[in-house]
C-alpha cells in the first residue's frame, strides 16, 4: 500500500507522528510537510521536523511540483492530511493547487482515490463547515481528530492511539491501537 501523508500548519502534529510510526513497517509512505508545520513540530513536539521525515519512505518539499507525486499518473492508494489547517482545507475544497499538498489532494479527488482530511480547528465557522461539506460531497473522508471516551483512555497516548487507529481502519489496515466498542 502506498500512502501520502501531508502535515499542515495546524495544531495536532502528534497525530501525524503517531500515524507515521505505525505505518513505517506497514506501507510505503510519501511525506510532505508545509513550512508552517515544520515550525509547529518544533513547538509542539520539541523535535526538529527532520526527525519526522525519517519515519517516511520518501519525503518531498511542498513546493516541489516536479515531484512524481504531482502527477495523476503516479499510483498511490490514499492521502491523509493530518492535521489539516483551515487554509489547506479551503484550498483543497476550492481546487487551488498552489502547493504539492493541495495538488496531491486534488489528484486524489479527480482520480477517485481515498482522501482523509483531519481538520484541526475549534470551533468551526460556517465557511469551514461548507468547505468540509464540499469535500465530503466530492468523496473525501472528513475526519476531525475527535477522541472517544468509552474506551476509558488512561493517558494522552491512549487518546492519540484511538484517533490514529480509526484512520488505519479507514485505510483498511488492521490494528489494535484501541479498545473497540463492545470489547471494553
From Swiss-Prot:
GO MF annotations in UniProt: carboxy-lyase activity; flavin prenyltransferase activity
Residues that hold FMN according to the record: 9-11, 34, 85-88, 120
Reactions that this protein is recorded to catalyse: dimethylallyl phosphate + FMNH2 = prenylated FMNH2 + phosphate
Entry keywords, A to Z: Flavoprotein, FMN, Prenyltransferase, Transferase
UniProt-listed Gene3D superfamilies: Flavin prenyltransferase-like (3.40.50.1950)
Binding site residues for dimethylallyl phosphate: 150, 166
EC number: 2.5.1.129
Chain's role: Flavin prenyltransferase that catalyzes the synthesis of the prenylated FMN cofactor (prenyl-FMN) for 4-hydroxy-3-polyprenylbenzoic acid decarboxylase UbiD. The prenyltransferase is metal-independent and links a dimethylallyl moiety from dimethylallyl monophosphate (DMAP) to the flavin N5 and C6 atoms of FMN.
Family per record: Belongs to the UbiX/PAD1 family.
Name of the protein in question: Flavin prenyltransferase UbiX
Organism: Methanocaldococcus jannaschii (strain ATCC 43067 / DSM 2661 / JAL-1 / JCM 10045 / NBRC 100440)
Gene: ubiX
Amino acid at each position: 500500500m502506498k500512502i501520502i501523508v501531508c502535515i499542515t500548519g495546524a495544531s495536532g502534529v502528534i497525530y501525524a507522528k503517531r500515524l507515521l510510526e505505525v505505518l513505517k513497517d506497514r506501507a510505503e509512505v510519501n511525506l510532505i510537510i508545509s513550512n508552517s508545520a515544520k515550525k509547529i513540530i518544533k513547538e509542539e513536539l520539541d523535535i526538529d521536523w527532520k526527525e519526522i521525515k525519517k519515519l517516511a519512505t520518501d519525503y518531498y518539499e511542498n513546493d516541489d511540483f516536479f515531484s512524481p507525486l504531482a502527477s495523476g499518473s503516479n499510483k498511490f492508494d490514499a492521502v491523509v492530511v493530518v492535521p489539516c489547517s483551515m487554509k489547506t482545507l479551503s484550498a483543497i475544497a476550492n481546487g487551488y493547487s498552489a502547493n504539492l499538498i493541495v495538488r496531491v489532494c486534488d489528484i486524489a479527488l479527480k482520480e477517485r482515490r481515498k482522501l482523509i482530511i483531519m481538520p484541526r480547528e475549534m470551533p468551526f465557522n460556517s465557511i469551514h463547515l461548507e468547505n468540509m461539506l464540499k469535500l465530503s460531497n466530492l468523496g473525501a473522508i472528513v475526519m476531525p481528530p475527535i477522541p472517544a471516551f468509552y474506551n476509558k483512555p488512561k493517558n494522552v497516548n491512549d487518546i492519540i492511539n484511538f484517533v490514529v487507529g480509526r484512520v488505519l481502519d479507514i485505510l483498511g489496515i488492521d490494528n489494535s491501537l484501541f479498545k473497540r466498542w463492545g470489547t471494553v
